[in-house]
């Protein structure tokens, strides 16, 4: 194998390693983001139940009750 061929193989290995490591990190981040959004929705639903039934809270926080 010549030097040019060895260098090309080296670059391909580096590129493949970079692509695999960057895409696996994105999946984990997307999963955490989705979990955080779901948690926010659950807490908002709990606030809605308690606040919307109370007229004073409903008046003070119209953004929750809509």
From Swiss-Prot:
The entry lists its GO molecular-function terms as:
acetylcholine receptor inhibitor activity; ion channel regulator activity; toxin activity
Instruction: Locate the Cysteine amide modifications and list their residues.
Output: 65
Region forming the signal peptide: 1-25
Question: Disulfide pairs?
Answer: 51-57, 52-65
Record annotation: effect of changing residue 64 to D: In non-hydroxylated and non-gamma-carboxylated analog; complete loss of potency of inhibition of rat alpha-9-alpha-10/CHRNA9-CHRNA10 nAChR. No change in potency of inhibition of HVA calcium channels in rat/mouse DRG neurons
Q: Which residues carry this modification: 4-hydroxyproline?
A: 55
Sites where 4-carboxyglutamate occurs are at 63
Swapping residue 53 to K leads to an effect described as: In non-hydroxylated and non-gamma-carboxylated analog; 1.7-fold increase in potency of inhibition of rat alpha-9-alpha-10/CHRNA9-CHRNA10 nAChR. No change in potency of inhibition of HVA calcium channels in rat/mouse DRG neurons
What are the record's GO terms for cellular component?
Answer: extracellular region; host cell postsynaptic membrane
**Looking at the record, which segments are called Ser-Xaa-Pro motif, crucial for potent interaction with nAChR?**
53-55
Mutating residue 58 to K has which effect?
In non-hydroxylated and non-gamma-carboxylated analog; complete loss of potency of inhibition of rat alpha-9-alpha-10/CHRNA9-CHRNA10 nAChR. No change in potency of inhibition of HVA calcium channels in rat/mouse DRG neurons
Q: List the transmembrane segments.
A: none
Phenotype when changing residue 55 to A/D/K = In non-hydroxylated and non-gamma-carboxylated analog; almost complete loss of potency of inhibition of rat alpha-9-alpha-10/CHRNA9-CHRNA10 nAChR. Decrease in potency of inhibition of HVA calcium channels in rat/mouse DRG neurons
Q: What is the effect of changing residue 61 to D/K?
A: In non-hydroxylated and non-gamma-carboxylated analog; about 4.1-fold decrease in potency of inhibition of rat alpha-9-alpha-10/CHRNA9-CHRNA10 nAChR. Decrease in potency of inhibition of HVA calcium channels in rat/mouse DRG neurons
- Report the subcellular localization: Secreted
Q: Where is this region: Key region for inhibition of alpha-9-alpha-10/CHRNA9-CHRNA10 nAChR?
A: 54-56, 60-64
Which InterPro entries does the entry mention?
A: Conotoxin_a-typ, Conotoxin_a-typ_CS
Q: What is the effect of changing residue 52 to S?
A: In [C3S]Vc1.1(1-8); shows similar potency of inhibition of HVA calcium currents. Shows 95% inhibition of human alpha-7/CHRNA7, but no inhibition of human alpha-9-alpha-10/CHRNA9-CHRNA10 AChR
Modifications after synthesis and translation: Vc1.1 is described as having no post-translational modifications (except C-terminal amidation), whereas Vc1a contains a hydroxyproline at Pro-55 and a 4-carboxyglutamate at Glu-63 (and a C-terminal amidation).
Say which domain of life the source belongs to.
Eukaryota
Name the protein family.
Belongs to the conotoxin A superfamily.
| Name of the molecule in the record | Alpha-conotoxin Vc1a
